[in-house]
Amino acid sequence: MNILFATSEAFPFIKTGGLGDVSYALPKALKRKGTDIRVILPKYSSIPQEYADNMRKVAEFTVGVGWRSQYCGLLELEKDGVKFYFIDNEYYFKRNSAYAQMDDGERFSFFSRAILESINHISDFTPDVLHCNDWHTAMTIPMLRDQYFNNPKLNNIKTVYTIHNLKYQGRFGKEILWELLGFGDEYFSEDKFKYYDSISFMKAGIVYADAITTVSPTYAEEIKTEYYGEGLNGLLQSRSKDLYGILNGIDTDVNNPSTDMFLFDKYDVNNLEAKARNKEKLQEMLHLPKNRDIPMIGIVARLEEQKGFELIKEVIEELLQENIQLVVLGTGDQRYEDMFKFFAWKYPDKLSANIYFDGGLAQKIYAASDMFLMPSRFEPCGIGQLIALRYGSVPIVRETGGLNDTVFSYNEFTGEGNGFSFTSFNARDMLYTIKRAIGFYYDKDVWSKLVQRGMNGDYSWEKAAEKYMRVYSNILHKW
């Protein structure tokens, strides 16, 4: 089975969020299942030089963007047994950031068509399935169906479209249809691309894909409701039989406390004394009082409303009256950055606010913290709670999306559970749940079982890869 995996980012070349992790780890897992899977993404100028220097040129050709023809280079590089292709065009991809550019509609219109044109220039590979991810590659699917149906190399390709976050849809003015995408006015309709008075790239992918997946079973159900559906819930309900919720994994080779080079001390489930040493050394590094017995709560996240920081804002003063240390890492909304900076100044022995991002420090926080807080308003899957579990940091989460599928609240009567959770998006409920977790932290027998249960869980991509294989097989065997 030949799979072309189209994405706007992939670790270790470019990563701004969870999509980058998925686009590296899932293809590796699918490769182990025997597929010939190849990944295609833009050649951003920010790709580390060590990779750029080793890319081999496959082809050069032009790609139509409306009435213009734009240069396109196709390069390749193998990483961990998977072949990666890179779409090269400095005008579109030599930027100071991968996204949030004024011409993103044009950039990813070019990229969508360049993906299809590239297939014509890869002599040893024709995909059976084109697997597109999020809005940046969504328009590739209707282009394939309605503009390339006479191309003998492309006309039998089936399509899978994965929604990583429905909130970000790629919405642009309707003039983009004919100016950049080569579609006529008839595509500005409710059954095609129209989203109120604009067009939605993501909607186009959902309408035209043979199968649709999203990144957890709960999120697959949530997005069919008005609250989570971002205006597409009716469409998603109509495509329910083609919609699959497949839980993301994490790369357990990269996220492994027994081999993680970023940790002060490596450890495993049989050596939790070394985890405690990580805590003490992080306390020293961040100028917090050195005390292995005080519960440390970690937060590693984008500081934005989706992640539930409005709840923290409501009760942070009360939370910091508890005998805890709170370690925060991330950037985002100025309100939340300023909030954490202020309370770190007010309570320097209780709060360390690290308003930047550092992958090494993130790993240290997972290893050192006793609890990991994710009170998200919505969370399609979430990776933080999975890394936390693997590193023995007990998650405290709101029951939404993938958090609901992976964290099971501790039941003191049965002893079951691997974390703590609350249902309503409510600050008092969150605070109660944190206090409940702190209470059980001091019961060492209960806490050690929670930590061990989390560390012994299977968070690899193997189960997800099996489910994606079934989705691919289903659409390939449909008449």
Swiss-Prot record:
MF (Gene Ontology): alpha-1,4-glucan glucosyltransferase (ADP-glucose donor) activity; alpha-1,4-glucan glucosyltransferase (UDP-glucose donor) activity
Keyword Transcription in annotation: no
Pfam families, per database record: Glyco_transf_5, Glycos_transf_1
Record pathway: Glycan biosynthesis; glycogen biosynthesis
Binding residues annotated for ADP-alpha-D-glucose, in chain numbering: K15
Family, similarity comment: Belongs to the glycosyltransferase 1 family. Bacterial/plant glycogen synthase subfamily.
Signal peptide: none
Keywords of this entry: Glycogen biosynthesis, Glycosyltransferase, Transferase
Catalytic activity: [(1->4)-alpha-D-glucosyl](n) + ADP-alpha-D-glucose = [(1->4)-alpha-D-glucosyl](n+1) + ADP + H(+)
GO biological process: one example: glycogen biosynthetic process
UniProt protein name: Glycogen synthase
PANTHER family from the UniProt entry: ALPHA AMYLASE DOMAIN-CONTAINING PROTEIN, GRANULE-BOUND STARCH SYNTHASE 1, CHLOROPLASTIC/AMYLOPLASTIC
General function of this protein: Synthesizes alpha-1,4-glucan chains using ADP-glucose.
InterPro entries per UniProt: Glyco_trans_1, GS/SS, Starch_synth_cat_dom
Disulphide bond pairs: none
Record-linked Gene3D superfamilies: Glycogen Phosphorylase B (3.40.50.2000)
Enzyme Commission number, as recorded: 2.4.1.21
